[in-house]
Regions:
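Active-site cofactor/cluster-binding pocket
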Residues: 2-201
């Protein structure tokens, strides 16, 4: 599969729920880019990192001055939970790409019966109205298969890096996992990334 040019300028928007490793994934992808000589600017947009809160972050590759991503500007949206993918959709430009978990993690309002969780098919349909390409992966299930549900975010990164849409290859991501993650969780995350790659093959 071809890979975007190392000189590509991309705006990536991440959205998830606290406890899912959204910020860890953002930082890992940023480090992978920097290791390859790609300029990377990132930042937390909105953080309620305690378990269950909404977490949003941005990563801009290729020489941007500010980590800010406004509505309709993101080239790629990484959603770590389907409903959060839907909430982050306004930030995606028309014709952009989405990588999303298809495994719901119902928010407290749904758990308490105060709100209804939309079906995954409805979420897919709304994403299809904006995104030219979209992948929905059972990230929590694949993370569990890799050895830890906490590696679900790495499943998404593996899929994104294997898609050819980023200026990073899958091998670049694997190298960053080996270099930047603690030794005790490297094998699990490498396995998770591989499952993500296989899901978009």
């Amino acid at each position: 599969m071809t890979t975007a040019s190392r000189d590509a300028r991309l705006r990536i928007y991440f959205v998830g729920v606290g406890g899912q490793g959204t910020l860890t994934a953002t930082n890992l992808l940023a480090r992978a880019a920097l290791d390859c000589g790609i300029e990377a600017v990132g930042g937390e947009v909105h953080g309620m990192a305690q378990r269950g809160g909404v977490v949003e972050s941005a990563l801009l590759l290729g020489g941007w001055r500010s980590p800010r991503v406004d509505r309709g500007e993101a080239d790629i949206l990484l959603g770590f939970e389907p409903l959060e993918t839907l909430r982050g959709l306004p930030y995606l430009r028309q014709g952009g790409a989405v990588f999303s978990s298809s495994d719901p993690l119902a928010p407290l309002s749904v758990a308490l019966g105060q709100a209804v969780y939309p079906g995954i098919e409805r979420i897919r349909a709304q994403v299809a109205e904006v995104a030219a390409k979209a992948w929905f992966l059972p990230c929590r299930s694949l993370g569990r298969e890799a050895g830890s549900v906490q590696s679900a975010g790495t499943v998404l990164l593996g899929a994104a890096c294997a898609s050819g849409l980023l200026p990073l290859t899958f091998d670049d991501l694997a190298a960053a996992i080996r270099k930047h993650l603690p030794a005790k969780i490297q094998a699990v995350n490498l396995a998770a990334a591989e499952l993500g790659r296989a899901a978009v093959a």
